[in-house]
């Protein structure tokens, strides 16, 4: 949630379900988990794209998210499943619970944190909170894709102008909208990328809603992720460059990590 107007948040939730339909990450996660029933927590579960399939696979799942519009979509997807629950909560400031077998940080959440906390500190905090929420021997699953940056390299400072349309379409209520990103200012010293997220929505009644939101993200290279995991008491057991099981290469722009709490 980026302090969006309610109309914008509703449009984003609808567009997420229309645009983000891949299942390869879910299938890959299920292959790592195995068939034995597990108690699983998904952090920032959104509309249940991952949470619901985990429940349908027989696992007992819990999820939370700070976006009420996304959470409202889970019920219809879950149907009569009794092994799934979810609530509204803040990943940085709220309690995650304890004694889970697996904590899932998927959907690139480590690169999409919304908080007033220092970004790198918030990234490390999520890993530490995952450790606290896990039972001894439990696992953390991380899917991390830092905005096209190669995870094995530092990134030089740069400034890009221009506009990139991310989503464009009509929501479930017939309102047409567009979400785009404007500019990109990356500081290699801080690892912070700054840009503007622009929303333009035309409602069915002709009303036009526009909102610009200043955003920033922190690029943590793979070496830093490894340090955070080690400091939190994790041992990496499996690591891949993507959810197809390919190895991490020199030019990989993402990483999937499955690490055990020791």
Q: What is the meaning of each model-derived region?
A:
Residues 216-262:
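C-terminal lobe and adjacent flexible extensions of AdoMet/dcAdoMet transferase-like proteins
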């Amino acid at each position: 949630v980026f302090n969006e107007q309610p109309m914008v948040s509703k449009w984003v939730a609808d567009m997420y379900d229309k645009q983000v339909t891949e299942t390869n990450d879910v299938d890959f996660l299920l292959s790592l988990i195995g068939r034995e029933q597990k108690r699983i927590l998904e952090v920032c579960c959104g509309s249940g794209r991952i949470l619901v399939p985990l429940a349908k696979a027989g696992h007992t799942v819990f999820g939370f998210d700070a976006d009420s519009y996304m959470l409202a979509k889970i019920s219809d997807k879950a149907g009569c499943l009794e092994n799934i629950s979810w609530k509204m909560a803040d990943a940085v400031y709220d309690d995650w619970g304890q004694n889970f077998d697996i904590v899932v940080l998927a959907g690139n959440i480590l690169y999409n944190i919304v908080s007033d906390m220092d970004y790198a500190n918030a990234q490390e905090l999520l890993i530490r909170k995952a450790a606290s929420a896990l039972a001894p021997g439990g696992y953390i699953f991380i899917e991390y894709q830092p905005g096209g940056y190669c995870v094995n390299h530092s990134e030089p400072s740069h400034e890009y102008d221009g506009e990139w349309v991310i989503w464009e379409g009509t929501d479930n209520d017939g309102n047409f909208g567009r979400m785009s990103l404007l500019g990109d200012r990356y500081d290699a010293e801080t690892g912070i990328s700054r840009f503007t997220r622009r929303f333009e929505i035309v409602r069915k009644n002709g009303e036009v809603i526009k909102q610009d939101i200043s955003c920033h993200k922190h690029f943590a290279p793979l070496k830093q992720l490894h340090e955070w995991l080690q400091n939190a008491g994790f041992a990496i057991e499996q690591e891949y460059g993507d959810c197809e099981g390919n190895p991490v290469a020199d030019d990989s722009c993402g990483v999937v990590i499955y690490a055990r709490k020791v």
